[in-house]
Amino acid sequence: MDPLGPAKPQWSWRCCLTTLLFQLLMAVCFFSYLRVSQDDPTVYPNGSRFPDSTGTPAHSIPLILLWTWPFNKPIALPRCSEMVPGTADCNITADRKVYPQADAVIVHHREVMYNPSAQLPRSPRRQGQRWIWFSMESPSHCWQLKAMDGYFNLTMSYRSDSDIFTPYGWLEPWSGQPAHPPLNLSAKTELVAWAVSNWGPNSARVRYYQSLQAHLKVDVYGRSHKPLPQGTMMETLSRYKFYLAFENSLHPDYITEKLWRNALEAWAVPVVLGPSRSNYERFLPPDAFIHVDDFQSPKDLARYLQELDKDHARYLSYFRWRETLRPRSFSWALAFCKACWKLQEESRYQTRGIAAWFT
């Protein structure tokens, strides 16, 4: 029996060593897998770079990260329920430290389009986190759209078919009697104005202007033209009967502040060059603007504007819509609140192909 005595401790020592080595091997495999999964973006069966999810917010009040400030210009962020009473709130921040916990990330295209692989948020991405692609620029000024495919769940732009529609302006009914007094025609001492920052000599709008000004005097403000200090813009433009709301590129729904602010807030009749008349009429009454397509040539348009200048009744007919409607303008803060409300209205979690859609 003595030879059997030491055998038992020897077996136990070997068993413990084997178990320890096995556990160590499993730990090494696990951490190796974890590191690879963090360094390499995964493409899931749904064809995207993130897993299927219901998109349910991780917080009772959704946390939204602004990946960049639009055009790198910070703005004040009032509570959404203060902007529009009775609406829901979100915690909206530009602090990237909250990225791992954020329920949604808003990415403004302009700041990431130069080098998307380096400028977009990095992995790992929290499951259920929704990314919102945001742009107020036209496709002509949005580069590398293809690089955005497969990342985003929602779109936000001036396009009416966006998931989150953020137009440059809109009309809404007066809640009571119109607050504005009737138009003071005697204050309209000038005829036609145009404020332009990016001249673009070969652009459609500059070519049209050059033909128009051969038949009609147009006062041009902006870079390389008459100075127009920002604080005096509305005061200056309000002296004009007409304003050339010429867009820098022609795309569906691309109707910008050139109409909503420069023309309508100055109580000037907008003369528009942009998408089709029918597209404008989705957002404005047909007698609220003059479209260049209504005339065979710039010369014919010039003649019409000169006729309206002499016919007060016909000119004033372009303001009848103001008896029941008033113009409102876009703000960045309101756009972010629209994203907040959309996230709480539905939990849809899909991938959007940006390049094929935004044309």
Swiss-Prot record:
Q: Please give the annotated consequence of changing R110W.
A: Reduces dramatically alpha(1,3)fucosyltransferase activity towards type 2 chain acceptors. Loss of site-specific fucosylation leading to generation of approximately equal amounts of VIM2 and sialyl-lewis x
Q: What is the effect of changing R303G?
A: Found in individuals with plasma alpha(1,3)-fucosyltransferase deficiency and no clinically relevant phenotype; complete enzyme inactivation
Biological process terms in GO annotation: ceramide metabolic process; glycosphingolipid biosynthetic process; L-fucose catabolic process; N-glycan fucosylation; oligosaccharide biosynthetic process; oocyte axis specification; protein glycosylation; protein N-linked glycosylation
Fetch the InterPro entries from UniProt.
Glyco_tran_10_C, Glyco_tran_10_N, Glyco_trans_10, GT10-like_C_sf
Q: Which residues are glycosylated?
A: N46, N91, N153, N184
Give me the segments passing through the membrane: 15-34
Q: Which domain of life is it from?
A: Eukaryota
This protein's GO cellular component annotations are: extracellular exosome; extracellular region; Golgi apparatus; Golgi cisterna membrane; Golgi membrane; methylosome
Which Gene3D superfamilies does this UniProt record tie to the protein? Glycosyl transferase family 10, C-terminal domain (3.40.50.11660)
Enumerate the subcellular locations listed in this protein's record, separating them with semicolons. Answer: Golgi apparatus, Golgi stack membrane; Golgi apparatus; Secreted
Q: In which tissues is it expressed?
A: Kidney, liver, colon, small intestine, bladder, uterus and salivary gland.
MF terms in GO: 4-galactosyl-N-acetylglucosaminide 3-alpha-L-fucosyltransferase activity; alpha-(1->3)-fucosyltransferase activity; fucosyltransferase activity
**What's the PTM story here?**
N-glycosylated.
Stored Pfam families:
Glyco_tran_10_N, Glyco_transf_10
Family to which the UniProt record says this protein belongs: Belongs to the glycosyltransferase 10 family.
Q: How does it assemble?
A: Homodimer and monomer. Monomer (secreted form).
Name assigned to this protein: 4-galactosyl-N-acetylglucosaminide 3-alpha-L-fucosyltransferase FUT6
